[in-house]
């Protein structure tokens, strides 16, 4: 059943549920769908509707006070399906290395290993509608310092609100309330357990509802999970789960940048026939004291690889640009030509950000329409973040030279050791992947994490957090596939088969 609470009178709210989930994005929908299959009675609270609306989206506005970043009401979406509604579809699991503790990276390591989520990979592939990943190998000629890696693309990208809408609408096991804004979390003063999620619609002076369940899950996204817990300070002044000042800290993103361009004598090489993405090996990361990263080597092709009309366009531009007189004549007739006669393609990076306690979500002094303080993002990087990018780019340039593939032009800002950070949005860079991670990190104890290995909040035995906010380290892989794996693992914890 799906009901918009601003239109339903009276609201068909059951007296109690097995599990109440706040957030109808990837994690929330996967949990609702799979828990229903285990016989659980589920309430799913989604603050938006079926489609984008300014009424809902405006509640995502906030401030950036650290490194320049996307506007907070642009980098995420607030309607059924969540940010999957503008997801690009890229998928890759985290590496074994990403879960481990590394001496050169402070506060690295998870309290779980890849073997704890590996059993859910095939089921996650089915949900994401992607095929299995091929075996990966060291890159020939790299001296064991680089490896070839692969990604899968969900095509078209799965829009979770659309994919599961029919099931959610017809299911007797799941109640979905749209326009249901979570505004408070009630605690039982004796047990410390969550006793209710308090929510309301958009109508001025409209009713306030309480959802009762045995267990509760917050699945609102990497920014909103932290903001919600920090705002839940009516009974716990410092915010729920924030006994050790960890909620909102360790905000991490993936650094996305163009690093340079490569030039080859031939537009097709033995390298271009195989690798498109490379990453440093574990040995290189340890030796160079860097984090994980994926480097995309784009634009290596031959004209024979392109079908008409792309083939003709590429050939024609190459001919026109080769002769300055012809180029001048054509430009007078049709306008400027984009000539890059000897440039084969670009080098770009999707790089891991290492954990940084001072990179965080705070609360603003400004309140939203429901009286909740808005988020403030203070995104901070560390020197190793730049070092990882610079070291990897130089290694790939050396690889091109050693193997007589061609030459590479690395941009000045990458090479400048005195420039500690990549350029920001004002210089035309994407800067990040719209991936919000780490703000309610998993820990072995409440001194180093907000949730335990089962995504249960320390000190609140019936409250769980789902999504990329529980990540301890982030690797370079896009987070959506791992979000689904962790949601399936949480499903098994909440409702063992």
Regions found by a protein language model. Name each.
Residues 175-190, 342-353, 358, 375-380, ...:
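A glycine-rich dinucleotide-binding beta-alpha-beta segment and adjacent secondary-structure elements
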Residues 72, 103-198, 407-408, 420-421, ...:
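Conserved redox-cofactor binding core of oxidoreductases
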Residues 33, 215, 219-220, 226-345, ...:
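Mid-to-C-terminal "cap/lid" subdomains and adjacent gly/pro-rich loops that border
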Residues 17-44:
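N-terminal Rossmann-like FAD-binding beta1-loop-alpha1 element of flavoenzymes
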Residues 37, 50-51, 58, 73, ...:
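Glycine-rich loop(s) and the adjacent beta-strand/alpha-helix scaffold that form part
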Residues 1-19, 37-38, 488, 496:
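Extreme N-terminal leader/targeting segments of oxidoreductases
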Residues 25-26, 223, 470:
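Residue-level detector of alpha-helix initiation sites
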Residues 61-135, 271, 350, 354-365, ...:
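Redox-cofactor-proximal catalytic regions of oxidoreductases
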């Amino acid at each position: 059943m799906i009901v918009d609470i601003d239109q339903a009178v009276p609201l068909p709210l059951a007296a109690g549920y097995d599990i109440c989930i706040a957030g109808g994005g990837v994690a929330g929908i996967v949990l609702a769908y799979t828990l229903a299959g285990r016989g659980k009675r589920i309430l799913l609270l989604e603050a938006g509707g079926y489609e984008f609306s300014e009424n809902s989206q405006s509640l995502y506005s906030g401030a950036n006070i650290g490194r320049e970043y996307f506007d907070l009401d642009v980098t995420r979406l607030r309607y059924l399906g969540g940010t999957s509604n503008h997801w690009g579809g890229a998928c890759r699991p985290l590496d074994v290395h990403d879960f481990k503790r590394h001496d050169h990276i402070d506060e690295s390591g998870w309290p779980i290993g890849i073997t704890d989520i590996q059993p859910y990979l095939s089921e996650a592939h089915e949900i994401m509608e992607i095929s299995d990943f091929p075996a990966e190998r060291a890159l020939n000629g790299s001296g064991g310092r680089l490896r070839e890696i692969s990604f899968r693309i969900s095509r078209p990208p799965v829009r979770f609100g659309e994919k599961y809408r029919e099931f959610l609408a017809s299911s007797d096991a799941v109640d979905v309330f749209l326009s249901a804004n979570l505004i408070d979390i009630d605690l039982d003063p004796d047990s410390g357990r969550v006793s209710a999620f308090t929510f309301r619609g958009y109508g001025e002076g409209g009713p306030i509802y309480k959802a009762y369940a045995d267990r509760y899950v917050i699945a609102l996204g990497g920014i909103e999970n932290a903001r919600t817990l920090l705002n839940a300070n009516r009974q716990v002044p410092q915010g729920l789960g924030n006994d050790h000042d960890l909620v909102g800290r360790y905000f991490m993103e993936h650094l996305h940048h163009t690093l340079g361009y490569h030039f080859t004598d031939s537009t097709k090489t033995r390298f271009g026939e195989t690798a498109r993405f490379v990453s440093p090996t574990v040995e290189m990361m340890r030796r160079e004291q860097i984090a994980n990263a994926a480097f995309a080597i784009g634009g290596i092709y031959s004209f024979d690889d392109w079908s008409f009309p792309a083939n003709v366009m590429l050939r024609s531009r190459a001919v026109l640009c080769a002769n300055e007189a012809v180029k001048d004549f054509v430009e007078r007739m049709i306008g400027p030509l984009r000539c890059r006669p000897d440039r084969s393609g670009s080098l770009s990076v999707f790089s891991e950000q290492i954990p940084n306690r001072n990179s965080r979500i705070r609360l603003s002094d400004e309140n939203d329409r429901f009286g909740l303080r808005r988020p403030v993002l203070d995104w901070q990087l560390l020197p190793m973040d730049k070092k990882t990018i610079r070291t990897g780019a130089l290694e790939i340039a050396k690889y091109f030279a050693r193997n007589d593939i061609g030459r590479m032009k690395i941009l000045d800002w990458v090479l400048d050791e005195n420039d500690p950070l990549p350029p920001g949005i004002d210089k035309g860079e994407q800067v990040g992947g719209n991936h919000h991670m780490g703000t309610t990190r998993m820990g072995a104890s409440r001194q180093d994490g907000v949730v335990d290995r089962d995504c249960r909040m320390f000190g609140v035995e019936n409250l769980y957090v789902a999504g990329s906010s529980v990540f301890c380290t982030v690797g370079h892989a896009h987070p959506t596939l791992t979000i689904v794996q962790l949601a399936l693992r949480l499903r098994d914890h909440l409702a063992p088969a």
